[in-house]
Amino acid sequence: MKLRFLGAVGTVTGSCSWLQDPARGWNFLVDCGMHQDEPDGAPGAPKDWPFDPATLQFVALTHAHLDHCGLLPALYRDGFRGPVRCTPETAELARLVLGDAARLPGSGITQADVDRILWKPFREDQPFGQPRPVDQDLFLRTYRSGHIPGAVSMEVLWGAPGVGQRNIVFSGDVGPGGEDAEVAPMLRFPWNPRSACFAVLESTYGGTVRTPQERDPALRLARLHALVAGIVETGGTLLLPAFAVGRTQDLMFDLHAVVAADPLRLRDLRIVLDAPLARRVQGVVARAMQRVDVMRDKVRPLWLGKQVFRQLGLDDTEPDDIQAALDIIAMTLTGVRGDGSQPIARGNALAQQWRALTEPPTKAAPDRGRAPQGPTVIVCGSADGCGGAAASWLQILLRDARHVTATTGYTAPHSVMGRVATLADLPLKERRRHPGRIEWSDGRTLPIRDIGATVTRLRGYSAHADQADLLDWVFLCRQGGDGVVAPTLFVQHGGDRERVALRAAILQRAAETGQRISVVLPQRADEWVSLEGQPATPPA
């Protein structure tokens, strides 16, 4: 078996890894993502495939973000006819995400391209961590990665099961936190993989160590409450541009929690979800939270986190409490409970005061031409602010001092929200001196001197692991062995500064603990790496 990294080499986006064993007839990809927001553009255009797409057997997909699945339509358009193997949740979400991308001008794909994709989700009646055969002596095994619902780390195993079988595990995008130290509002903790011969690790925040304050869910909620309470006082609007998959659902859950914790003070607050893709995603995520993993000796929620039960004072071993948690998730994401509209009668005061707050999708779309009347939170699509609802709202709300705009995660420096975020630390009187302007691709502009709204960064919502989390992924593998996830580790999916910092941290931890590990930073997309050089690690 040999491996070639076709994307995310020294960049954050464009994940695509090509695995091949000509002697055994194996030829497949792990992920097939597009480049996004990279300064050097997207070198991996469909015409540049280094293979004939018709010769590929399958694509193993880690999750449904465009930087991992965005080139699938082009791959099928250019001749690929095999299946995409992934979790059922990833298949559902990717259909929506790719369909939405096909509607964007200049995307280069059409709905017909998306409809060609042959999704082959993993069977739900098999335990999640069980190897799944895809060919003679070729298997895939998944581990929940804690990034978004459906997201997994993907292990490839080849050779007859037992001693001598070889394997490589691709991290996909790893989420923050761990068991009983969850950071995300709803999603269950990431799994550590079993030890392998080789591993590939993302490094989006490989050089970042978040403070305890940034990781503390209680402080995250307190920061959100302060913003919401502020606009209730001013009668203004809080604008939260957010990613449609993952980030929007987390924000909606926390907004409902904030109101449930302070119902009298916030009783007049209006919450608007102005994001067509996110509205379609909400139901998929609500259904995903119902899924359980039935193993030999236990049954556990697959995607619904333990932290939800702790926050709501519910017992995750009691069927009625489990149903109460699922009802709260359904109210939050879809506005409808599964068993009617009676208040929740179990759990703590927060659970019992929880109400569905978002307006139903059947209601007329909000008027983006003027600011809402009364205190309002708008969660909108287009997290970069460059188009869609965010672009319209920004041009209305940024001018008025009553309003607040907050970033909810990473924004590319050259994007609209990236430029807006730079104003967070610039006092209003200094903005008045600023000669620059915010520009949109349709020609609309807004002078920075005219921006009177408060601009802030709402921290705590990143769905990516930081350096400490990534070190845990490397050194806290589920299986014994040599104490590291693999003796050879490839670090990609990150800028070079992040990759170099992560490599240094890994080598330092290895030296301190007496572990041996080789950390490789792939540099070129045209080089093959042999996967036959390490002694086989028998996968258990």
Q: What are these language model-derived features?
A:
Residues 223-419, 429-430, 483, 492:
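Hard-cation-handling environments
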Residues 512-528:
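Conserved phosphate-binding/catalytic loops in two-lobed NTP-binding clefts
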